[in-house]
Each structure stands twice: as structure tokens, then as C-alpha cells.
């Protein structure tokens, strides 16, 4: 039996090499990403012989949802099974956004962020992260990354034109899979598709300095987030072994070269761990480290998980840490850990075995 190819792996120009004329490719894109077609036979504006040809050569179901859990805060965690049987997790984070209309009335509407995985597992080995416990199985293809977003939008009846944010902060190190992640960014940005601007896509990294520079040279227009979590190399190496390859100085040099929109900032994720990196002396060092960088710091309180070595700090200590940064002119927020009760928060995702 002929093996079908995942059509979500293709940019329009690549699909155009296989399907003529080009306007048919645009129609296919619209059916998949905007009309949420379930199969090729649904694509009624295409000639019957083309629909048959597509069905004989392609599929667009690279992920299958085998389980989902909803948090009391509205977050939904999805367990997806890939074609080869491996599993990944993704999270939908709904939030309310309030605006003032022309008449001065306060109106609110739903705003969505989707946290996607870029690998099955991860090889970075961060001591505080559950994903790292199982090691790296393989990279996801661009279509498998896109497939997570498409499935979640379809399942939740989110119109294709509704603006959403994408964060590459699920399982895996995105820059360890830069080729496929960058391609996913381009596919998601297509006007005939989901039309998710790169400015609404944030790529997070544990600090692969070489790949940060490569990403910057691509000029994709994406936002960058650095998982920092420590202010000196000794502690960071203890928490994040990747620091042996790319130390803090190398990371900061790469960040300074990274092209960023004038209205945006490089995001620095800082996981506060009780008694480890949450002292005020650490906050003072962080201020020095970020000097001269257009930065925003996201403070995250450690999220407990099975077999975890660390403890969650008190909110009081986190606020003191935040206040010191803010008073020194560093833009800083304490990030709400959504999905904590369903193990969907930062550091809690993993490849769930098939016992479910």
C-alpha cells in the first residue's frame, strides 16, 4: 500500500511543484486551514479528479487526539498520538481580553494562546523539567507542529481569522529542530492558511547561542524567549546541563544580535525555585545581566511534578523579587501558571505512555 504524505508539511510553493495550476493550491490551503475540511472529498470547489489524486497521495491528519483534560481555569491539555505511535502534549490557554469601545463601554472577548511541542521528548536535560526525564525520541516535522494547532482550532470552533498566539514552549527544544520549526512558522503565516503573523509566534530556547544567531539571520519576525533560570554559570549548569555548551555570556551575545521589532522585547523566562535561585541577590545580578538589553522578564513559580527535586517558592518572595527588578527599570511580570491542576503548566509536559 502506498504511503501517504502529510500535506501539512508543504508550503504553497512546494505544493505548487506537484499540483497545477497554482490557484488550485490556494484553494486547497483555504479548504484545509480556513474551512476546516475533514477530508479531500469535502473540497467541493476542486475538480473530482484532483480530489481523487489528492486522496491517493496525501493525508492531513498527522496527529490524533487520544485524551484531553480541562483545568478549572479553562486551560485544556491535549495528548496527541503521531502516525508512528509516539505521543506529544499541547495546551490551549484561553484568556479574557478587555477593551474600551468607541462609546466608552468595557467589552471582553476570548483570546487564545496555543502552546505546541516541537520534539517528542527533549535532550536538554533540565533538572526541573518533566519532559527531559524521558530523553529525546525524535524531531517533529513542520506538519506535525502545524497539525497540533489546526486540530485544536477545529476542535474548539475557533474561526481561522481569530487572532491567536503561538508559543513554542511545549515538549522539546525548538532550536534543536530549527529547520522544521522555522518552516512551521512560515506555513502558519500564509494568508491563504491560518494567517498567524510571525509577530504572534514566540520561539523559546534553553539558550542554543549558535541557533539563536541562525534564527536571527532568517529574519522571520518571530519573538524570542530565553529560558534563563539562573544568573551565574555554576548554578545554571547545575539546573541546565546545556549551559556547558553555551554559557550565559554566549547566550547574551547572541541575544544582542537578534533582530527584534522596536515595539517588542526579548522575553527572559526565570523559574523561581525555593532556596535555589529566588534570593534578592539573584535579582540584583539579573538586573546587571540584562543591562543594555530590551528585555521583559517572566517570573514563573516552580510547578511541582512527579519525581521533582525542588519546591515552589512563596508568592511573597516572588513579589519581592519582582519589585526589585521593577524598581531597577526591568519590565517584569509574575506569570500565572495556567493548567497546574492537570499537569499542563511549564515543565510538566511529557510523552505519556499508551496506558491511557
Curated annotation (Swiss-Prot):
Which reaction is recorded as catalysed by this protein?
adenosine(2503) in 23S rRNA + 2 reduced [2Fe-2S]-[ferredoxin] + 2 S-adenosyl-L-methionine = 2-methyladenosine(2503) in 23S rRNA + 5'-deoxyadenosine + L-methionine + 2 oxidized [2Fe-2S]-[ferredoxin] + S-adenosyl-L-homocysteine; adenosine(37) in tRNA + 2 reduced [2Fe-2S]-[ferredoxin] + 2 S-adenosyl-L-methionine = 2-methyladenosine(37) in tRNA + 5'-deoxyadenosine + L-methionine + 2 oxidized [2Fe-2S]-[ferredoxin] + S-adenosyl-L-homocysteine
Under Gene Ontology molecular function, one entry of this record is:
rRNA binding
Instruction: Please give the SUPFAM superfamilies that the UniProt record associates with this protein.
Output: Radical SAM enzymes
Q: Locate the Radical SAM core domain: which residues?
A: 108-341
Cofactor info, note text: Binds 1 [4Fe-4S] cluster. The cluster is coordinated with 3 cysteines and an exchangeable S-adenosyl-L-methionine.
**Family annotation (PROSITE patterns):** RADICAL_SAM
Q: Which cofactor does it need?
A: [4Fe-4S] cluster
Q: Where does S-adenosyl-L-methionine bind?
A: 172-173, 204, 227-229, 303
List the Gene3D superfamilies.
1.10.150.530, Aldolase class I
Where along the chain is the active site annotated? 89 (proton acceptor), 346 (s-methylcysteine intermediate)
Any Pfam family matching the protein: Radical_SAM
Protein's cellular compartments: Cytoplasm
What EC number(s) is this enzyme filed under? Answer: 2.1.1.192
Q: Where does [4Fe-4S] cluster bind?
A: 122, 126, 129
Its keywords, alphabetically, are: 4Fe-4S, Cytoplasm, Disulfide bond, Iron, Iron-sulfur, Metal-binding, Methyltransferase, rRNA processing, S-adenosyl-L-methionine, Transferase, tRNA processing
Q: Which cysteines are joined by disulfide bonds?
A: 115-346
UniProt miscellaneous comment: Reaction proceeds by a ping-pong mechanism involving intermediate methylation of a conserved cysteine residue.
Tell me which NCBIfam families the record gives: rRNA_mod_RlmN
Its family remark reads:
Belongs to the radical SAM superfamily. RlmN family.
Summarizing the function annotation, the protein's role is: Specifically methylates position 2 of adenine 2503 in 23S rRNA and position 2 of adenine 37 in tRNAs. m2A2503 modification seems to play a crucial role in the proofreading step occurring at the peptidyl transferase center and thus would serve to optimize ribosomal fidelity.
Q: What is this protein called?
A: Dual-specificity RNA methyltransferase RlmN
* Species annotation: Campylobacter jejuni (strain RM1221)
